[in-house]
């Protein structure tokens, strides 16, 4: 089994570095369903899963703490089908993602066989970087304390 180090690629992603390490440690590669993780900007992400043949009622999305879990269970076919070639996969799956702090699901929709899960990072204002203005007309602290002493 090949072991790829994805950490340089995932450093800029919010919360997905744990996913890469858990994928690297597992014995079975995650090959179903195929998915993309898109970064729209520093605070907006989208996970897209390709789920051809699934219906919206076959899918379940849960968030428990920092873990986002997507489950799919296709309804069993009522007809017995004899396949000459079967390239489409209709099997149950569970796919989990570890979300970073302050990252939450803002929307999920299923369209044309694609499940889109939108994520938003809402950092509280107290934790956001703050700009400090550099004053030009105020006296320095040493001068001010010398004036106060006299």
From Swiss-Prot:
Principal location: cytoplasm
Coiled coil start-end: none
Disulfide bonds: none
InterPro entries referenced in this protein's UniProt entry, alphabetically: A-crystallin/Hsp20_dom, ACD_IbpA/B, HSP20-like_chaperone, HSP20_IbpB
Domain named sHSP: residues: 26-137
Subcellular location per the Swiss-Prot or TrEMBL entry: Cytoplasm
GO cellular component: cytoplasm
Keywords: Chaperone, Cytoplasm, Stress response
Source taxon at top rank: Bacteria
Gene3D superfamilies documented for this protein: 2.60.40.790
GO biological process terms on file: protein stabilization
Assembly description: Homodimer. Forms homomultimers of about 100-150 subunits at optimal growth temperatures. Conformation changes to oligomers at high temperatures or high ionic concentrations. The decrease in size of the multimers is accompanied by an increase in chaperone activity.
HAMAP family from the UniProt entry: HSP20_IbpB
Domain notes: The N- and C-terminal flexible termini are involved in oligomerization and in the binding of non-native substrate proteins, and are essential for chaperone activity.
Stated role: Associates with aggregated proteins, together with IbpA, to stabilize and protect them from irreversible denaturation and extensive proteolysis during heat shock and oxidative stress. Aggregated proteins bound to the IbpAB complex are more efficiently refolded and reactivated by the ATP-dependent chaperone systems ClpB and DnaK/DnaJ/GrpE. Its activity is ATP-independent.
Family as reported in the entry's similarity comment: Belongs to the small heat shock protein (HSP20) family.
Full protein name: Small heat shock protein IbpB
Organism (species): Pectobacterium atrosepticum (strain SCRI 1043 / ATCC BAA-672)
